[in-house]
């Protein structure tokens, strides 16, 4: 690797280091081999998770609403008892996803491994980083559509129809805009209007969650913020999008994958030059002076190691 790329990656280490709960295994990027396509909504709409309470598991201080697991998510609801709750979710792929829910709050947790058998284990904070087991259960998930987990908001990609980021996406993109046009427009806007927040990157703490509207209003963020903002804007346009967390080389990083109808999942792909897709994640691009040099690095999928899909 050239000295210039090494220097850039060293800088990005300071900007993009995020502490993520350890996984029991490594995830793999997947493509849709079922022939299924994402649902079509006319007019376009932002999907809103619901927790009607018709089917629940657990007990106070933590209830899991599984009424809509066929839509690709469950909702964790924590009592206001002053303790943080931890939900660990795993499927047959061996990846353990860990979610923390503060006292009195709720969180939407997606089934990003698709249909299948999931093991959910729940814990309550006892003291500091010590947690005691609450309950565990096996869930059988059969999705109505395999793309739903990547269209709904969740704890990591948190948005509503009233989010400024969603309103912006709808204002930037015409109703009849193609997916390629939508992806390119959102990509260009975010990378041109958001810059690295070095102070935030230097002080980010364990359990950090992006606030997409804060990123938009301040025009600053770290790698996690870039990826979450773009993911939310694309999902609000009914474009399935994965927020990926892992490593670029040996640096903790976040990037996005998008689904193009009739083409499939495009991994680490954000822009389209009219002839081919260029693998380009938004944080490297926004902070790169030598575009050709950095594209030669980030365009190689071997440089990316996936840990989690959110």
Predicted features along the sequence, with ranges:
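Active-site nucleophilic cysteine motif
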Residues: 182-186, 219-234
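Short N-terminal helix-initiation segments at or just after the protein's N-terminus
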Residues: 63-64, 199-204, 223-225
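Hydrophobic/aromatic-rich core segments of domains that either
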Residues: 225-303, 307-310
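Secondary-structure boundary elements
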Residues: 153-218, 266, 274-286, 293-310
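N-terminal accessory/pre-domain segments preceding catalytic cores
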Residues: 2-180, 265-268, 301-310
């Amino acid at each position: 690797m050239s000295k210039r790329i090494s220097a850039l990656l060293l800088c990005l280490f300071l900007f993009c280091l995020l502490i993520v709960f350890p996984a029991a295994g490594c995830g793999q990027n997947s493509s849709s081999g079922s022939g299924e396509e994402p649902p079509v909504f006319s007019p376009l709409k932002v999907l809103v998770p619901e927790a009607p309470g018709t089917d629940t598991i657990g007990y106070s201080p933590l209830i899991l609403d599984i009424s809509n697991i066929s839509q690709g998510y469950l909702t964790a609801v924590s009592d206001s008892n002053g303790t943080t709750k931890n939900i660990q979710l795993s499927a047959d792929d061996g990846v353990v996803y860990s979610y923390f829910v503060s006292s009195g709050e709720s969180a939407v947790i997606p089934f990003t491994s698709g249909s299948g058998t999931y093991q959910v284990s729940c814990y309550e904070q006892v003291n500091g980083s010590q947690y005691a087991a609450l309950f565990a259960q096996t869930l059988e998930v059969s999705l109505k559509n395999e793309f739903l987990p990547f269209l709904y908001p969740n704890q990591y990609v948190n948005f509503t129809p009233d989010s400024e980021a969603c309103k912006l996406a709808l204002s930037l993109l015409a109703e009849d805009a193609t997916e390629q046009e939508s992806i390119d427009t959102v990509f260009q806007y975010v990378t041109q209007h958001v810059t690295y927040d070095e102070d935030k990157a230097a002080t980010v703490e364990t359990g950090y969650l992006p606030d997409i509207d804060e990123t938009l209003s301040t025009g600053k963020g770290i790698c996690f913020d870039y990826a979450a903002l773009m993911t939310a804007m694309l999902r609000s346009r009914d474009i399935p999008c994965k927020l990926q967390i892992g490593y670029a080389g040996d640096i903790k990083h976040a990037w996005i994958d998008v689904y193009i109808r009739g083409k499939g999942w495009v991994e680490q792909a954000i822009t389209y030059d009219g002839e081919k897709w260029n693998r380009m994640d938004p944080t490297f691009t926004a902070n790169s002076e030598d575009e050709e040099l950095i594209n030669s690095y980030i365009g190689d999928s071997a440089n990316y190691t996936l840990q989690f899909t959110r």
